[in-house]
C-alpha cells in the first residue's frame, strides 16, 4: 500500500524487504539519515586537501590555521535490550553505510547480529576505520592545549580543541595518508570518469584492498558510542574529509558531508581514559565526556546539530520481560525519581557479600565485581576450593605466560625517565597490565614471576615466566580474534543431528570455500558412524530393542549403499561415454570390493570376512566404503557428504524410534583423526582434514584442555615481524588450548601474541613481547567487561565505597530474568552517586514532539 486518500503512509525501497513488524519503527530513521546524507556544503566550506597537508607537515597544532570540518549527526539511544541492535541491522540492509563498533566486542556483536540474517563482511572498530594503529596506543594525549577558551557556540573552536588534544594521533594519520598518495588504481578510475562522465570512482572499494572504508559512504554507524570520548567524533570527521579529499571521491566533489550515526546508551557508559605516568610508574584514570552526553547535554551542539529532529529513542527492555523489574530499570535509565517502592523491590535480591564470594555457593553463576583485583581474588579462592575438592571434571591446571624484555630497551627507558636504579621486578609490577593486549589479563590468577637472563643473536634479554590457573570444562572467552582449527565434535546424537538439519555451521565456516565445510562434516560423519554401534553396547538397554536396532542399522546401511552404488555405476557409464568416467569409476569403487583384489584373499580370510559380515553387530558401512580422497573437489565432495548425511539421518531415525531420549541424549564424539582426553591433556593423532577459522570474543567456549600435538598451519605464524624475540619464544614450546564452542565443535586455538612499544619523551622503545593463550574465565568478570552481554545467572558484588547509579544499572540489566539476580547491597539503600545527569535531557526529549520514539 503506497497511497491512501492522497497521503503517503509507507514507502518500501525496491532493493530490500524488511520484516513488517520492524518497518513502522525504523522507516522514519532511514528516511531522516538518507536526507542528511544528501546535504552538501559549498566549495568554500569544503576542507581542501592542502589543509590536511599542512597538518601533516606541522610540528605543532599552533601552525595549523583553524577551520570547520562540516558534519551531521544522528542519535539512536535507548535502554538495555530495547532493540538498538535490530535497528543497526535494518540500517545496514537499507543504506550504503560504514558500520562499526566502538570496541572490538561491540563490532563483533554487530557482526553476529548481521551474519545471523545473511552473509556479512567483517565489522571493524571505528578506530580501525579512521586509521588508528597500534603505535598510537602509547601516544600522549592532551600534550597541546588550545590557546584560547573555546566558544561553546563555535564548532571551529570545539573541533580545534579536540585537534589539539588528539594531535599526536591525528597528525600521524594525516602524515601516513598524505605520504601514501593517491593509488594508481584510483588515478585510472578518475581518468575514466572524466572521459565518460560515469561514476567509475565508486568502484574503487571493489578494485583495491587498500581502499579506506570511509570513502565507501558518507554515513558512518558507531555502535556503543557511549564509551568514546567526544574527541573521537572529531577524529572520525577529520579522517572522513582527509581520505575523501585525497581520493577525490564523487561525494567530496559534490560537497556531501559525513553523517555520524551514534548508537548507545549515555546513562550506561562512561568514557574512561588511562594515562601512564612514567615518573611515578602509575596509571592515571580519568572520566571524559562521552560522545552521546556531549551531544545531548551541550545546548549549543544540540541546536547546531538540530538534535530534536535527529534523535530516536528506543524504549522497553526486551531482554528481561518481568514488568516490575523493567519498571525499575526504566527509572534508572531515564532518571526518574527513585522511591521506596523501587527500593523494596530490589531488597529481595540482596544476600551477604560473603555468600557471593563463597565459590561453593551459586555454582554456575557469573560473578560481577567492581575491579580487576576483586575478580583476581575471587578466582584465586575458587581455584583453591576446587583443588581441595579434587574434582576430576573441574580440575585446576596451569598454563604458562612468557614475556621477553629487551634489556637494551630497558636500559634506554631508565635513562629517558631518570630512574637509573629501577629494577626489572618493579617495572614489571607497574606495567603488567600494559604488556598484554587485553584488560582481562589482570583478572588471571597467576604465580610469582620467574626471571631468566640470557643473550640471543648478540642481544641481551630477560625471559619472564608466570603460570596462570584455569579450570577444566569451565566457560571461558577469548580476548582476541586468533586462528583456530576445528577438528572434531563433542555433544549428543541429538546435537549433531541439529547441526546437520540447520545451516549455521556452513554459514559460519563456508562463506569463502564451502567445499572445506562439506569435506570437514563428511570426515566427521565417516568417523562417527561407529558411534551408533557403540551406543548399542551400553549396559542396561533392553535386549529385544538392541537386536531390532542391529537389524534396522544393517537394513538401512545396505539399502543406501546399494542405491548409491547403482547411482554411481550409472554415472560412471555415462562418464565413460563422454570421456570423464575416471573419477566416477573411483567413486563407484568406493562402495564395493575390488574384484581383482579378491583373487589375492585366502579362503581363511574370506571365511573370517564373510563371517563378520553376517554378524549384525558389525558395521557393514566400513566394509563397503572408502574414505573421501584428498584430491576430491566440487560435486564429488558434496555427493559424499549427502550420502553420509542421509545414512546418519536414517540411522538416527531408526535408533531414536526405538530408544527415544535415551539415545538422542547419549554422547556422540567424532574427530578427523584419533583424539583422546586424559585430564587436561588432549592427545590428537592428526589435524589433517580440520577446517581453519577464527575465534570470536563474543562467543562462549568450554575449556577442554591443552595439546602439544603440532599444528602445521600455526607454525611460525605468530613470530612474523618479531625477529628480535622470535628465537627465544620458539624455545618455550608452549602447549595450545583446546576448546569446544556452543554447538559442540572442538578446536585447537593458536597462541596470543602482543608486542609492547612504549613512548617516552617522543621516543618509541620496543620493550617487550608477550605470548599467552588469550583466554579469560566467564565465572567472574568486572562490571565494565559485562557491558553488552546478556547473562543467565548473575551475582553482583558492588564496591563498598560510593556507588554510581549507572554502574548499578549496567550490572543489573545483564540478567535475562530477575529470578537469577543476587547482589551484596541494594544500590538504592546505600549512599549512591546519581550519575544520571544526562537523564534530564532525555526526559525533555521524550516530551518533545520532534524526537522519535520506538517501543
UniProtKB/Swiss-Prot annotation:
Gene3D superfamilies: P-loop containing nucleotide triphosphate hydrolases (3.40.50.300). It comes from the Viruses. GO terms for biological process: DNA replication. Pfam families: Herpes_Helicase. Its EC number is 3.6.4.-. One of its GO terms (molecular function) is hydrolase activity. InterPro entries: DNA_helicase_dom (IPR003840), HSV_HELI (IPR034711), P-loop_NTPase (IPR027417). One of its GO terms (cellular component) is host cell nucleus. The keyword Hydrolase applies. It is found in: Host nucleus. The keyword Nucleotide-binding applies. Transmembrane segments: none annotated. It is an enzyme of class 3 (hydrolase). Keywords: ATP-binding, DNA replication, Helicase, Host nucleus, Hydrolase, Nucleotide-binding. ATP binds at residues 78-85. Associates with the primase and the primase-associated factor to form the helicase-primase complex. Belongs to the herpesviridae helicase family. Component of the helicase/primase complex. Unwinds the DNA at the replication forks and generates single-stranded DNA for both leading and lagging strand synthesis. The primase synthesizes short RNA primers on the lagging strand that the polymerase elongates using dNTPs. Possesses helicase-like motifs and therefore may act as the helicase subunit of the complex. This is DNA replication helicase. The gene is HELI.
Amino acid at each position: 500500500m503506497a497511497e491512501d486518500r492522497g497521503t503517503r503512509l509507507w514507502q518500501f525501497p525496491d532493493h530490500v524487504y524488511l520484516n513488517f513488524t520492524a518497518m513502522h519503527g525504523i522507516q522514519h530513521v532511514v528516511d531522516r539519515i538518507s536526507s542528511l546524507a544528501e546535504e552538501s556544503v559549498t566549495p568554500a566550506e569544503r576542507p581542501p586537501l592542502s589543509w590536511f597537508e599542512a597538518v601533516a607537515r606541522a610540528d605543532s597544532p599552533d601552525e595549523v590555521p583553524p577551520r570547520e570540518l562540516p558534519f551531521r549527526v544522528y542519535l539512536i539511544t535507548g535502554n538495555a535490550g530495547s532493540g538498538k541492535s535490530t535497528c543497526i541491522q535494518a540500517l545496514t540492509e537499507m543504506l550504503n553505510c560504514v558500520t562499526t563498533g566502538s570496541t572490538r566486542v561491540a563490532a563483533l556483536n554487530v557482526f553476529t547480529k548481521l551474519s545471523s540474517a545473511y552473509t556479512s563482511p567483517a565489522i571493524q572498530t571505528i578506530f580501525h576505520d579512521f586509521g588508528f594503529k597500534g603505535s598510537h596506543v602509547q601516544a600522549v594525549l592532551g600534550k597541546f592545549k588550545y590557546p584560547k577558551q573555546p566558544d561553546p557556540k563555535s564548532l571551529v573552536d570545539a573541533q580545534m580543541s579536540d585537534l589539539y588534544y588528539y594531535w599526536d594521533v591525528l597528525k600521524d594519520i594525516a602524515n601516513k595518508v598524505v605520504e601514501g598518495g593517491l593509488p594508481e588504481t584510483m588515478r585510472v578510475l578518475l581518468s575514466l570518469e572524466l572521459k565518460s562522465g560515469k561514476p567509475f570512482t565508486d568502484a574503487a572499494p571493489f578494485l583495491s584492498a587498500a581502499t579506506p572504508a570511509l570513502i565507501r559512504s558518507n554515513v558512518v554507524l558507531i555502535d556503543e558510542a557511549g564509551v568514546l570520548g567526544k574527541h573521537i567524533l572529531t577524529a572520525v570527521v577529520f579522517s572522513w574529509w582527509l581520505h575523501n579529499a585525497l581520493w577525490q571521491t564523487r561525494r567530496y566533489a559534490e560537497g556531501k558531508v559525513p553523517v555520524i550515526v551514534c548508537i548507545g546508551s549515555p546513562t550506561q557508559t562512561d568514557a574512561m581514559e588511562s594515562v601512564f605516568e612514567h615518573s611515578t610508574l602509575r596509571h592515571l584514570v580519568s572520566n571524559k565526556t562521552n560522545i552521546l552526553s556531549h551531544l545531548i547535554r551541550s545546548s549549543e551542539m544540540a541546536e547546531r546539530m538540530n538534535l530534536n529532529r535527529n534523535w530516536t529513542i528506543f524504549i522497553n527492555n526486551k531482554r528481561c520481560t518481568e514488568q516490575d523489574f523493567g519498571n525499575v530499570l526504566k527509572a534508572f535509565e531515564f532518571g526518574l525519581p527513585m522511591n521506596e517502592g523501587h527500593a523494596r523491590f530490589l531488597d529481595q535480591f540482596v544476600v551477604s557479600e560473603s555468600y557471593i564470594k563463597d565459590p561453593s555457593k551459586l555454582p554456575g553463576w557469573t560473578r560481577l565485581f567492581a575491579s580487576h583485583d576483586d575478580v583476581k581474588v575471587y578466582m584465586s579462592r575458587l581455584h583453591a576450593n576446587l583443588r581441595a575438592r579434587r574434582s576430576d571434571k573441574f580440575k585446576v591446571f596451569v598454563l604458562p605466560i612468557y614475556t621477553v624484555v629487551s634489556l637494551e630497551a630497558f636500559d634506554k627507558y631508565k635513562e629517558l625517565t631518570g630512574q637509573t636504579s629501577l629494577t626489572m621486578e618493579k617495572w614489571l609490577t607497574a606495567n603488567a597490565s600494559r604488556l598484554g593486549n587485553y584488560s582481562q589479563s589482570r583478572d588471571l590468577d597467576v604465580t610469582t614471576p620467574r626471571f631468566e637472563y640470557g643473550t640471543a643473536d648478540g642481544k641481551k634479554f630477560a625471559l619472564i615466566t608466570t603460570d596462570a590457573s584455569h579450570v577444566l570444562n569451565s566457560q571461558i572467552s577469548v580476548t582476541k580474534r586468533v586462528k583456530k582449527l576445528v577438528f572434531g565434535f563433542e555433544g549428543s546424537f541429538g546435537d549433531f543431528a541439529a547441526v546437520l538439519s540447520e545451516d549455521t555451521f556452513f554459514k559460519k565456516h563456508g562463506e569463502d570455500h564451502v567445499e572445506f565445510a562439506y569435506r570437514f562434516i563428511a570426515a566427521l560423519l565417516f568417523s562417527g558412524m561407529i558411534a551408533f554401534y557403540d551406543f548399542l553396547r551400553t549396559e542396561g538397554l533392553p535386549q529385544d530393542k538392541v537386536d531390532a536396532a542391529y537389524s534396522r542399522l544393517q537394513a538401512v546401511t545396505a539399502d543406501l549403499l546399494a542405491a548409491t552404488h547403482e547411482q554411481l555405476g550409472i554415472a560412471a557409464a555415462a562418464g565413460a561415454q563422454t570421456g570423464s568416467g575416471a573419477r566416477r569409476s573411483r567413486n563407484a569403487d568406493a562402495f564395493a570390493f575390488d574384484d581383482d583384489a579378491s583373487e589375492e584373499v585366502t579362503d581363511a580370510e574370506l571365511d573370517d570376512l564373510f563371517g563378520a559380515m553376517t554378524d549384525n553387530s558389525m558395521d557393514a558401512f566400513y566394509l563397503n566404503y572408502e574414505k573421501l580422497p584428498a584430491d576430491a573437489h566440487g560435486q564429488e565432495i558434496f555427493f559424499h557428504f549427502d550420502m553420509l548425511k542421509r545414512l546418519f539421518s536414517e540411522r538416527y531415525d531408526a535408533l531414536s524410534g526405538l530408544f527415544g531420549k535415551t539415545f538422542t541424549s547419549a554422547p556422540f564424539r567424532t574427530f578427523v583423526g584419533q583424539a583422546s582426553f586424559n585430564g587436561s591433556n588432549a592427545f590428537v593423532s592428526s589435524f589433517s582434514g580440520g577446517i581453519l577459522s577464527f575465534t570470536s570474543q563474543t562467543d562462549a567456549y568450554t575449556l577442554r584442555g591443552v595439546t602439544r600435538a603440532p599444528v602445521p598451519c600455526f607454525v611460525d605464524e605468530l613470530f612474523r615481524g618479531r625477529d628480535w624475540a622470535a628465537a627465544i619464544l620458539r624455545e618455550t614450546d608452549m602447549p595450545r588450548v583446546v576448546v569446544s564452542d556452543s554447538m559442540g565443535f572442538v578446536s585447537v586455538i593458536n597462541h596470543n601474541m602482543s608486542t609492547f612499544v612504549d613512548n617516552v619523551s617522543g621516543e618509541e622503545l620496543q620493550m617487550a613481547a608477550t605470548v599467552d593463550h588469550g583466554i579469560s574465565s566467564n565465572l567472574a568478570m568486572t562490571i565494565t567487561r559485562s557491558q553488552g552481554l546478556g547473562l543467565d545467572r548473575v551475582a553482583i558484588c558492588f564496591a563498598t565505597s560510593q556507588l554510581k547509579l549507572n554502574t548499578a544499572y549496567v550490572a543489573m540489566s545483564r540478567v535475562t530474568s530477575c529470578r537469577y539476580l543476587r547482589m551484596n547491597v541494594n544500590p538504592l539503600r546505600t549512599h549512591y552517586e546519581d550519575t544520571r545527569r544526562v537523564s534530564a535531557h532525555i526526559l525533555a526529549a521524550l516530551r518533545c514532539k520532534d524526537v522519535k520514539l520506538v517501543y
